């Protein structure tokens, strides 16, 4: 649908990204990207033209794309992330984001802060254990009050719908 945009620029550089569920590939392009009041002119993004390596849910689901919220260290091809571009353009009050995952209502992604209507009390901040993924150190994992895991790190990943870990501990 490039013809519908007067600001689209073909880059043509090819890429391949390996996700936990399989590879995707395509090429880079640039265009003005606008959403939720944010505006990023000449923003470089990846156009996926082969996602056949992903699971069936991705092939039959109705997706328009993926909004990467990871760190620069895992950005393929050195392309700046959406968060980095929003921070650099001073469009965010704070370089943070928050998710609200509703049970009976639509979820929300809040860029630049968190929506106080979705929580009460204070946040507990923990240091990141890595700046490749949103990794945090764990003291203990409990199930029904019993310690169940020797795993000492977790990755908080908004791009997956599953919990994963060592087979012997998650079965």
Model-derived features: positions:
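Classical protein tyrosine phosphatase
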Residues: 1-7, 161-171
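Signature of the N-terminal lobe/flap region of pepsin-like aspartyl proteases
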Residues: 1-58
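Soluble non-cytosolic domains of exported or imported proteins
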Residues: 23-27, 73, 77, 164
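Short, surface-exposed charged micro-motifs
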Residues: 25, 98-100, 153
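Extracytoplasmic/secreted envelope proteins and their assembly/folding machinery
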Residues: 30, 80-83, 170-171
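Aspartyl protease catalytic domain
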Residues: 34-149
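Short hydrophobic beta-strand that contains or immediately precedes a catalytic carboxylate
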Residues: 66-67, 154-158, 164
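Acidic, glycine-rich loop-and-beta core segments that form the ion-binding/anion-interacting portion
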Residues: 141-144, 157-159, 167-168
């Amino acid at each position: 649908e490039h013809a519908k945009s007067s600001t689209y620029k073909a880059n043509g550089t090819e890429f391949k990204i390996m996700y936990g569920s399989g590879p995707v590939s395509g090429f880079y392009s640039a265009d003005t990207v606008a959403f939720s009041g944010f505006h990023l002119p000449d923003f470089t993004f990846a156009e996926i033209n082969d996602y056949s390596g992903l699971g069936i849910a991705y092939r039959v689901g109705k997706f328009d794309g993926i909004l990467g919220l990871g760190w620069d260290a895992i950005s393929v091809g050195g392309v700046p992330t959406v968060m980095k571009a929003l921070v650099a353009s001073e469009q965010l009050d704070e370089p943070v984001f928050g998710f609200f995952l509703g049970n009976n209502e639509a979820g929300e992604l809040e860029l630049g802060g968190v929506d106080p209507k979705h929580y009460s009390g204070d946040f507990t901040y923990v240091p990141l254990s890595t700046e490749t993924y949103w990794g945090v150190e764990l003291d203990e994992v409990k199930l029904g009050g019993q310690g169940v895991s020797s795993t000492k790190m977790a990755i908080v990943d908004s791009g997956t719908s599953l919990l994963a870990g060592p087979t012997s501990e998650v079965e």
